[in-house]
């Protein structure tokens, strides 16, 4: 798993957005998939409004990437970034049997750290 975030996201805004990309890898494109993924993470980190990313993939080829952004404008700008658009097209042609993208607003966060609970709730706590 690759992650850019600290357990309690010091310095992140009270509310932010998550882009959840869930995908099933196809049997082709292995030689360039990792290179493309690494490049996209590097580019995303350079985008204004980017906060962090988490990536995980199971042995069954299903992966989940969650990227975090300050607002929907930052997400839209990332979606329209030229090299990212080319990678999206390559993903449809070579890398994935299917994928789903969801965008969610994060209004609360809780984390477990070594036996302490960090409660970074920004809403009511009733979520």
Regions found by a protein language model. Give the residues of each.
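Short S/T/G/P-rich N-terminal loop/turn motif that feeds into the first structured element of a domain
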Residues: 1-62, 72-80, 96-127
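Residues that form generic nucleotide/phosphate-binding pockets
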Residues: 20, 87-90
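Short arginine-rich
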Residues: 89-91, 95-97
């Amino acid at each position: 798993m690759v992650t850019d975030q600290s357990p309690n996201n010091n310095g992140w805004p009270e509310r932010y957005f998550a882009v959840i990309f869930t995908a099933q890898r196809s049997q082709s494109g292995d030689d360039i998939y990792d290179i493309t993924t690494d490049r996209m993470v590097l580019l995303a980190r350079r985008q204004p409004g980017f906060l962090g990313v988490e990536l995980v993939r199971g042995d069954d080829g299903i992966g989940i990437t969650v990227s975090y952004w300050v607002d929907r404008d930052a997400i839209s700008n990332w979606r329209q970034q030229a090299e990212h658009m080319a990678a999206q097209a390559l993903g449809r042609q070579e890398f994935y049997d299917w994928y789903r993208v969801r965008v969610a607003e994060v209004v609360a966060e809780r984390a477990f750290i070594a036996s302490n609970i960090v409660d970074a709730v920004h809403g009511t706590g009733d979520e």
